[in-house]
Amino acid sequence: MTEEPRPRAPITESAVLAWLETTAAAVEAGEVSAQELIDLLGELRRASAACADASDWLLLAAREGGASLRQIAPVFGKGYVRAPAARLEKLHRQAQTSGQWLAILRHKQTA
């Protein structure tokens, strides 16, 4: 019996840095126009917002799954529980569960 593959993030830090190196080289070589850079900027900013939304969903889902703030804190940086606690407090003004947050994201996408 084979195990189901574990969920993975759709984008990684190393993939972004590799893309940045390639893009920077193309820009330095004069192969990318200003308009193309502006288009990429817009695309990257939208993707960044989508990553932030996904991060918020994962935070809610982890808490629902029983993760403590102390367990979650290291991914926020210095290991302080204040950061995820503050983010949860802000999220809870809009959604109490990961399901509610996903519904908000779906609505936002169709609006």
Where are these regions (language model features)?
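General nucleic-acid-binding
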Residues: 1-35
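Short, Lys/Arg-enriched N-terminal segment that forms or immediately precedes the first helix
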Residues: 32-47
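Short, amphipathic alpha-helical "recognition" segments used to contact nucleic acids or chromatin
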Residues: 48-66
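The alpha-helix within a helix-turn-helix
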Residues: 72-74
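Short, Lys/Arg-rich amphipathic alpha-helical interaction segments
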Residues: 81-111
